[in-house]
């Protein structure tokens, strides 16, 4: 994919400082020179249906409701203006940042997913914490629902303050993992990120009790060799895809390690070793053991990640 092709990113915000961290992350990973169209998206808080029904019967309530809706829209415009100014201050061009607000239609998470699908967005970038008192869509429950309902658009979960540009691309030998590679090749050329293609070989302890394996050390040795042999072509292919997509050869490296009993822990440990601030994962991995799948490895990484972004590719 040509790195000059403009990418569309949907960023839901709610006015909290935590939500605005997604904008700081945009500036960090992409920068103002990257061809990006940013859509700042705000969902208006909804009123109880009973109030709306009463407004149809009582003029006084109807007038107050109209006044409240105007203030609601004004607040939305202020929040979106603040977000846009934050990006403009980072060097983004005026025409590259669009602001949109709307009433909730189906539900917060579904509205976000529907909007991204209609706009054919290339990414949803969302902070996982927002206004806790109001429990808006940046709280964990709704952010997880965005992952659940989303069918096609990669979701970037910004967890805390991210300060590192490098990317860890964790893969196995599944088609889903290779989709994450293709997406990295689509979205990362033009950035300054160094990409480490990473795989931790499954330890046999993930399959059976440790006590049984101690008597058969040759199995562990054979397994490590075979596991590395199986994944090596995929690691090589992943690097070729990224370089062909436009990343420089010195921007991409491969790391294959002997894994522990937890692939998620291996990934998080390697994030520190490679000085990465972003993890790319396929939503599901090998169907037989579900490596890097939601509900197992990806879920563990999302839960334990701090001050980093996790990009889940469906």
Where are these regions (language model features)?
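Fold-core signature of tandem repeat domains
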Residues: 9, 80, 112, 181, ...
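Structural beta-alpha unit
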Residues: 1-4, 48, 70, 78-124, ...
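Residue-level marker for beta-strand->alpha-helix junctions and adjacent short loops that shape enzyme
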Residues: 16, 45, 104, 131-132, ...
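Small/aliphatic-rich secondary-structure junction motif
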Residues: 1-66, 165-224, 228, 240-253
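Gly/Ser-rich helix-loop-strand patches that form or flank binding pockets
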Residues: 2-8, 18, 31-33, 111-163, ...
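Glycine- and acidic-residue-enriched helix-capping/strand-helix junction motifs
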Residues: 69-77, 228-232
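Aromatic/hydrophobic pocket-lining residues that form π-stacking "cages" and hydrophobic walls in ligand
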Residues: 26, 83, 112, 146, ...
């Amino acid at each position: 994919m040509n790195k000059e092709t403009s990418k569309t990113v949907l960023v839901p915000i709610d006015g909290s400082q935590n939500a605005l961290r997604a904008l700081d992350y945009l500036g960090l990973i992409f920068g103002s020179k990257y061809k990006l169209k940013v859509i700042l998206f705000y969902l208006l808080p909804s009123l109880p249906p009973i109030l709306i029904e009463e407004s149809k019967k009582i003029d006084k309530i109807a007038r107050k409701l109209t006044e409240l809706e105007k203030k609601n829209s004004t607040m939305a415009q202020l929040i979106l203006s603040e977000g846009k100014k934050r990006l403009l201050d980072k060097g983004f061009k005026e025409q590259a940042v669009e602001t949109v607000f709307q009433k909730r239609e189906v539900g917060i998470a579904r509205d976000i997913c529907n909007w991204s699908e209609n706009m054919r967005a290339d990414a949803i970038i969302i902070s996982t914490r927002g206004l806790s008192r109001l429990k808006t869509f940046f709280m964990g429950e709704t952010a997880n629902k965005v992952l659940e309902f989303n069918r096609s658009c990669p979701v970037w979960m910004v967890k805390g303050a991210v300060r590192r540009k490098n990317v860890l691309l964790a893969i196995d030998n599944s088609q889903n993992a290779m989709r994450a590679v293709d997406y990295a090749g689509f979205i990362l050329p033009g950035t300054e990120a160094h990409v480490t293609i990473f795989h931790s070989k499954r330890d046999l302890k993930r399959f059976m009790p440790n006590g049984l394996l101690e008597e058969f050390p040759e199995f562990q040795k054979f397994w490590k060799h075979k596991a590395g042999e199986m994944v090596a072509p995929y690691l090589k292919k992943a690097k070729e895809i990224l370089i062909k997509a436009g990343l420089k050869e010195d921007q991409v490296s491969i790391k294959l390690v002997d894994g522990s009993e937890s692939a998620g822990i291996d990934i998080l440990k390697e994030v520190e070793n490679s000085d990465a601030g972003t993890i790319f994962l396929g939503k599901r991995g090998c169907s037989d053991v579900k490596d890097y799948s939601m509900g197992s490895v990806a879920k563990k990484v999302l839960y334990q990640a701090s001050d980093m972004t996790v990009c889940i590719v469906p």
